[in-house]
């Protein structure tokens, strides 16, 4: 089994803090019943699945800009 590392994910997401937020949101989606975007034959935990999805470029995200009042 190949290990997924933060460095693998940082090739897709430049900011570590953004990576953590993205992975946690994806984990919540998986816990709520979303289907994995990658093959999960090894029955990995949702955290590992979300990181593998990010490293594979399967998870898309958009940064919204907030306007000051």
Curated annotation (Swiss-Prot):
GO terms for molecular function: DNA binding; DNA-directed RNA polymerase activity. Disulfide bonds: none annotated. One of its GO terms (cellular component) is DNA-directed RNA polymerase complex. The keyword Transcription applies. Pfam families: RNA_pol_Rpb6. Keywords: DNA-directed RNA polymerase, Nucleotidyltransferase, Transcription, Transferase. It catalyses: RNA(n) + a ribonucleoside 5'-triphosphate = RNA(n+1) + diphosphate. InterPro entries: DNA-dir_RNA_pol_omega, Pol_omega/Rpo6/RPB6, RPB6/omega-like_sf. Its EC number is 2.7.7.6. One of its GO terms (biological process) is DNA-templated transcription. PANTHER family: DNA-DIRECTED RNA POLYMERASE SUBUNIT OMEGA. Promotes RNA polymerase assembly. Latches the N- and C-terminal regions of the beta' subunit thereby facilitating its interaction with the beta and alpha subunits. Belongs to the RNA polymerase subunit omega family. This is DNA-directed RNA polymerase subunit omega. The gene is rpoZ.
